[in-house]
Amino acid sequence: MTTVLEWPGKVAAFALGRRLIADAEAGPSLGDGERGPESHLGGGALEREGRLGEGRPHLRDGEGVTHVPALHENLLVVGDNLPALQALLATHRGRVKVVYIDPPYNTGNAHTYKDHGHDHASWLSFMTPRLLLARELMREDGVLFLHLDDKESAWAQLLGHEIFGEDNSLGTLIHQRAKGGGNARSFVRGHDYVHVWARDAGRVGPFLTEKKSPAKLEVIDGRRMLVETDVLRAGFGRYARGSERRLMYEDIVAVKGEKKLAEVDAKLASGEYILRPWGTEGKHAVVRVTPAEKASSKMYSIIKALGGQNDLEPLGLGGVFSYPKPVELVKALVASQTFFDPDAIVLDFFAGSGTTAQAVMAANERDEGSRSFVLVQTPEPLRSKNAKAVVTASGSSDAEFPTISELTAERIRRAADIHSPGLSFTQLEVIE
């Protein structure tokens, strides 16, 4: 029997989400650029959010011009994620393959969407319309990863069952974090939870991971193949830096003998090996190619990943964010459902430090994919000396403290220099 959550404000929260969806279905955003007097009124979250839909949110570029994003355009949308999600329905409804979110944990943190700390009802009312809109953006075979700690895990799981249907729950993954928390009151918590739902579980394939991660994924004759260029070596032991350790096809007889050549020729004939020109001497490397479906295995439910600070240090952003999520974790989640879908769209509407954008870039770098990201982040000040130093050095802000969204954008730029030089993304503002 399914347990149904009840909390003060539940009816209003579901009604809001459904109304925003219905309003979006009624037609595209007006995009006239006019703000109603309700746009910046204060008050409670649901009171303000309840006014959404009266003028239909839309997206503007840096010149103040309404922008209708292309489907596979990399986006950073600055503003409240509820109107942003509604605005995205015009272009992305039913097109998102993966949603990854790491929402505020209801800790009372000032750098979140002003949750109330240990007020489960407020957190549930906050998340409900956002999850309803996220579901509308997902493809029929889309999945949502909801990453959080134990403060809201049980409540979030029941809420997710109600929104997606318990039959569409795909389980819970455990993220094993770096060790720490020696001052914990009872015991050291070394893990987080990642709850997973599908829009339609019957359409979702297995969650995959690579068996041989050092190899490269490529498309050969229309098929995705795992490519290993280091199959044959001239010898064992350490190699001097810059020296060629691969054994070229033309040198097999001299180094390994006729028997080894016959073995390689047989695998060339069967298609297990292919030859590729290598170097400047007209020789060929022996390359093993394996169909991607044979080079993958199902993901294990416990994922070990170090803290995200290790990812920020090489970007010159160390110490800017308190608890950034690890790129390898998000990359593994994204890749698990896009292993055979390298053109997928990935959405993160609690973008924070921008880990998801870098994870998408890293996944594309790994298999030459063209996945795109859609990030949403509020322009809240991040009161950190390191954050101020980064933005001051880049010359992008003269504010007392930079906003989180400014730093999200800066991380995307710096990560692109490493993973995807020349990558472009469009920064937009949501207009309510």
Q: Which residue ranges define each predicted feature?
A:
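DnaQ-like (DEDDh/DEDDy) 3′-5′ exonuclease domain used for proofreading
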Residues: 1-100, 108-122, 129, 389-392, ...
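Conserved S-adenosyl-L-methionine
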Residues: 5-7, 120-124, 151-153, 327-416
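Glycine-rich adenosyl-nucleotide cofactor-binding module
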Residues: 65-87, 310-343, 362
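A generic alpha-to-beta junction signature in SAM-dependent methyltransferases
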Residues: 92-93, 131, 137-139, 164, ...
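Conserved proline-anchored active-site loop of SAM-dependent methyltransferases
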Residues: 94-109, 160, 346-360
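Metal-dependent catalytic core segments for phosphate chemistry
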Residues: 97-119, 305, 310-314, 363, ...
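Conserved Class I SAM-dependent methyltransferase catalytic core
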Residues: 121-173, 374, 404-416
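Active-site-adjacent helix-turn-beta-strand microarchitecture at beta-sheet edges
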Residues: 178, 190-191, 198-319, 323-328, ...
